[in-house]
Amino acid sequence: MATVGFLGTGLLGSGMVERMLRRGDAVTVWNRTASKARALEPLGARVAATPGDAVAGAEHVHMTLPDDAVVDEMLEKVRPQLRTDAIIIDHSTTSPAGTKKRVPRLNGAGIKFIHAPVFMSPQMARDGVGLVLVSGPRAIYEDVRSELEKMTGEVWYVGEEPDRSAAYKIFGNSMLFVIAAGVSDVFAMAKGLGIPAADALAVFSKFQPGGVIKARGEKMARGDFSATFELTMARKDMRLMLEAAGSQPTVVLPSIAKRMDDAIAKGHGQDDLGAIAAEVVR
């Protein structure tokens, strides 16, 4: 049974704590909005009055906090109460730059700290599935590996570079946002054409474009723009999309159209659609 301090019991943090409690860990929680921490009390969590009280005596301290500033604030508050052998596991989505400074600064001061952001929903956290990304000192990772494996379906150690997991996390989130924006634009086209949104989604029960990330993405990363879908033809299709949407608000299509126009003006018209990335991969 692990002795755990947990800072930040919002939606994701609460899911993680529930999982820990079900497996028998002793968990002390703190949250700035105290009612969110107290909601875990009936499940067996001990609620601390201060962040320092939450970490006192804990072998492992987990954090799911909003941003870099709050992470740094909490770390300063809890330092005096940390056990000398405690390991801090930060699941917060933080900036690569902030994480790159934070990890060596704390480790250099004798505080064991590792960054481990996640790709999981609150329900996935409760169920112990999803992906945990970890970067930082290998020795610290090995010390917490078994605990992380109990929390999730997969743990991916991405290397010693302290900011790598933070970078990969925002890469993944960016794709989630692009997908949400793309779905919104599909609905805009559907509304402009008088097609119900639910019917528009039926296309993606047959056509699943996720494979493009690997197939076209690998070529783009190599700077290989040999055409399988010429950019000029893709731009024609973009015109059809914008015409279909009409006066309906679109999120990403106009920006993509502009990027296509810029790439065509620079001589990429006969290259592949992936040439919209030419400036960032060459």
Roles of regions detected by a PLM:
Residues V4, T94-F177:
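Rossmann-fold dinucleotide-binding core
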Residues G15, D53, H60, P66, ...:
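Amphipathic alpha-helical hairpins
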